[in-house]
Design a protein with these regions (language model features):
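Short, low-complexity N-terminal intrinsically disordered segments enriched in polar/charged residues
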Residues: 30-62, 66, 74, 78, ...
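Hydrophobic single-pass membrane-insertion segments
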Residues: 19-31
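Positively charged n-region of N-terminal signal peptides that target proteins for export
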Residues: 1-4
Length: 215
C-alpha cells in the first residue's frame, strides 16, 4: 500500500463514525484477523485505502466502546500482536505487547503489568489489562471524537510524538478530543491513536497510543 503524499485531516462527526462502524462490523464472525477490504477500480487506490482504513479504525473503536474483546482480537496482527503506549512517546522495547489470544481473553486476565511511568509523578503504572484500558485506552468515548486525523496528529503537548518513527511501515488514525470542557482551555485534551499495518487487502492493528495533556 502506498502512503499518501500529504497527511489528510478529517473532521468526522460521531454520527458519521457510527455509520463507519456499522459497515466495518459486517465482516464474517469466523474471518481472519482484521477486516477484509474489497479492491475497487474507482476512486483512486489511495482514496480506497483511506476509506478502508477508517472503516477498520471505526470498527476497533466500536469494539472498545462495547468492551467486545473477542471482536477486537480479530483486528490484532497475528504475529506482531499489538503494543500499548500510555503517553504519546512510543518505546517499543518497553511498552507492553499482547497477542491475539491475550486480547481475546482480556476481561478474564487478572495479572498486573507494568505499563510505563505516570506523568509528573514518575511512579510505575501497575495495572491489570482491564484497568489500563479504562485509564489509558478508552478514557473517553472515541466513537464520538469530534476530530479524526489520518496519518496526522491533531493535538500534541510536551511529550515527544514519535509514532511515525516507531512505526515507519504503518498508517494510523488519530481520534481526538482537542478539549472536553471549554473552561479548561484545552488542558484536558485526549486522543487515541490506532496504528495499522497494511498487508494485501487487510489492515492489522499493531499499536494503540494514548495521548493527553502532560506536565
Amino acid at each position: 500500500m502506498k502512503r499518501a503524499a500529504i497527511p489528510l485531516i478529517l473532521l468526522v462527526s460521531g454520527f458519521v463514525l457510527g455509520l463507519l462502524c456499522s459497515v466495518s462490523l459486517r465482516h464474517p464472525a469466523a474471518a481472519t484477523p482484521a477486516a477484509v477490504i474489497q479492491k475497487e477500480e474507482t476512486p483512486s487506490e489511495s482514496a480506497v485505502n483511506t476509506t478502508s482504513l477508517l472503516h477498520t479504525a471505526a470498527a476497533v473503536t466500536n469494539a472498545l466502546h462495547d468492551q467486545d474483546y473477542e471482536t477486537l482480537s480479530t483486528y490484532v496482527h497475528p504475529t506482531r500482536g499489538v503494543t500499548f503506549t500510555p503517553y504519546s512517546t512510543v518505546a517499543l522495547q518497553r511498552d507492553q505487547n499482547f497477542t491475539v489470544d491475550q486480547i481475546k481473553n482480556l476481561s478474564s486476565d487478572t495479572s498486573t503489568y507494568t505499563w510505563g511511568y505516570e506523568d509528573g509523578r514518575g511512579e510505575s503504572i501497575q495495572m491489570t489489562m482491564s484497568e489500563y484500558f479504562a485509564r489509558f485506552v478508552f478514557d473517553a468515548d472515541y466513537t464520538q471524537a469530534p476530530k479524526v486525523g489520518v496519518d496526522q496528529i491533531i493535538t500534541s503537548g510536551n511529550a515527544l510524538e514519535n509514532l511515525t518513527e516507531a512505526y515507519p511501515d504503518c498508517h494510523f488514525v488519530d481520534f481526538c478530543y482537542p478539549s472536553r470542557d471549554p473552561a479548561n482551555e484545552g488542558l484536558d485534551w485526549c486522543s487515541l491513536k490506532l496504528v495499522f499495518l497494511g498487508e494485501k487487502t487487510s489492515w492489522y492493528l499493531v499499536g494503540v497510543v494514548h495521548g493527553e495533556w502532560t506536565i
